[in-house]
Amino acid sequence: MKGGAGVPDLPSLDASGVRLAIVASSWHGKICDALLDGARKVAAGCGLDDPTVVRVLGAIEIPVVAQELARNHDAVVALGVVIRGQTPHFDYVCDAVTQGLTRVSLDSSTPIANGVLTTNTEEQALDRAGLPTSAEDKGAQATVAALATALTLRELRAHS
């Protein structure tokens, strides 16, 4: 995978001992399953073979489940897909999910990585899903972001 413009190389992390949770929606199953596969591969590569995985129906349900998971996990990865339709519903869902995840992260002081794809077309989502034909793997990227942030917070808290 070549990655999108500006995407950094994903660092190799030892996240042993980090309690990781992944919440993934079920709409656009092929894409969400691929995002989840990418997240699980990164977790395993970072020393976490058994992250907590919770499936929800749609993207709008992700923030409340992420909030509950943040109570007893060091990092949460949110995965889903919202594809623009012909009504304003897309904008409302994307805004609600993004604001919800940000609020949960700040309120809980737990990294919540936003791997919810918000695209204009299904093709754009497929190109970011981590499939063999995809340019990017947003599930993997979100997982690295969550784990790296959890490790940074652990280090900062150890020195405060």
Curated annotation (Swiss-Prot):
Positions contributing to (2S)-2-hydroxy-3-oxobutyl phosphate binding: 86-87, 128
Reactions mediated catalytically: (2S)-2-hydroxy-3-oxobutyl phosphate + 5-amino-6-(D-ribitylamino)uracil = 6,7-dimethyl-8-(1-D-ribityl)lumazine + phosphate + 2 H2O + H(+)
Superkingdom classification of source: Bacteria
Keywords: Riboflavin biosynthesis, Transferase
List of residues binding 5-amino-6-(D-ribitylamino)uracil: 27, 59-61, 81-83, 114
GO molecular function: 6,7-dimethyl-8-ribityllumazine synthase activity
Single GO BP term: riboflavin biosynthetic process
Pathway(s) where this gene product acts: Cofactor biosynthesis; riboflavin biosynthesis; riboflavin from 2-hydroxy-3-oxobutyl phosphate and 5-amino-6-(D-ribitylamino)uracil: step 1/2
EC number(s) stated in the UniProt entry for this protein: 2.5.1.78
Gene from which this protein is expressed: ribH
Pfam families: DMRL_synthase (PF00885)
Assembly behavior: Homopentamer.
Protein name per UniProt: 6,7-dimethyl-8-ribityllumazine synthase
Phylogenetic classification of the source organism: Bacteria, Bacillati, Actinomycetota, Actinomycetes, Mycobacteriales
Miscellaneous remark of the record: Was identified as a high-confidence drug target.
